[in-house]
Amino acid sequence: MGICASVFLLTSCPSGIKTGVKPSSVNIGSKSSATGISYNQKGGFQVDKKFSGQLTGPNLVFIEGGRFTMGSLEEDVLGMHDNVERTVSVQSFYMDETEIANVHYLEYLYSVQKDSTQDFYESALPDTTVWKNDLAFNDPYVEQYLRFPGFRMYPVVGISWKQVNDYCVWRTAAVNQQLAGSDKVKEKKPKKGAATAGTAATAATTRTNTTARLTIESGRVLPSYRLPTEAEWEYAAKAMIGTQQEDENQINQRIYPWDGPSLRQSQGKARGTMLANFKRGRGDYAGIAGKSNDGAIITTEVYKYPPNDFGLYQMAGNVNEWVQDLYRPLSFQDFNDLNPIRRNEKLDKASRYDSKNNNSLIDNKVRVYKGGSWSDVAYWLAPGTRRYLDEDSATATIGFRCAMISAGTNK
């Protein structure tokens, strides 16, 4: 009997794959399983047969997606009722292991200053005056925090939501250029006075030679770095994967990114030590000398405390983190239950908007931030809590980390 004579073998023969093996995204075969036409012939359809799965970008950790209960498990002490518990699912994705540190942002500023316009460089600078306070002597941080080597691995602060998105555009292009091996490509600096709109990627996108020849189809171009959605961030912070036993039933929920109600290590040699950088109470940022609680008066290094069960550091405390979502107090009513996000579009009936007498602080420019900071009490360390700020504003308590889709795989 010929190999292709049997009916049950016909489906595997045209693909050029070993008998009995079905084509997959990483083992596509030498021929189309739909037409039988060979791939990669001269003048024919080309596929990259070296593809073995999405590359993991620098600093990224894989987060296996799934179902979880989104929303705050803490008592709603402010009476906001803006994060009611509901069940949603998120697709697998990648997230930065740590918050973006000062040294990472300085790398970005160096590239922008070298390859972009002066106007855009100035617009990318963090607002270091966020440390100023009329009734507090924080002046040294204004000059030292961003650039002094002792703060290199402290989270960058004083950056707006818009600045963060520009950083993500640059980082995507810079990482893909590095992966393409085109570091030595000669670049052109934009002419003085050129338009600055959309120039976040100028520092990397002007490197067009090798990078431009790589396409999405090659599998060697990473998807875009971006801010995580609120659902992704909360899912990654809770890290309920650490509570799984024999089946998919979750017996316990988590208030914080770790088990239990305590903010201290409950066992081992580190028993009694703090698990996050936060403010214990009025005037108490770190305890007393010799018996420091969390070991940090302001922010601290991004690897300071133990990671959660996904391997992510500082998902509670240190600095709050921007997420993609627009803030709406009733987002839970509008959310899709798969990969939910709240965008700028108006979802309510037009009759419900009063454009003439709109005095609310909530508009299409306010963005959600989460996680709690060095200046927040423990209540805000719970992943389900949420606050908002104008996308053009910045504070000394908000930083960020990036995320990326996991294309074509859930594990």
Where are these regions (language model features)?
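Bacterial Sec-dependent N-terminal signal peptides
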Residues: 1-23, 236
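Disulfide-stabilized, aromatic/cysteine-rich ligand-recognition loop
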Residues: 13-39, 45, 49-50, 76, ...
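A short, compositionally biased domain-edge/stem linker segment
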Residues: 40-56, 208-215
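Mature N-terminal segment immediately following signal peptide/propeptide cleavage
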Residues: 55-72
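Short loop/turn microsegments at loop-to-beta-strand junctions
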Residues: 58, 223-224, 306-310
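Short, polar loop/linker segments at the starts of domains and inter-domain junctions
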Residues: 72-90, 269-277, 381-388
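Active-site microenvironments of metalloenzymes and redox enzymes
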Residues: 93-278, 326-328, 404-409
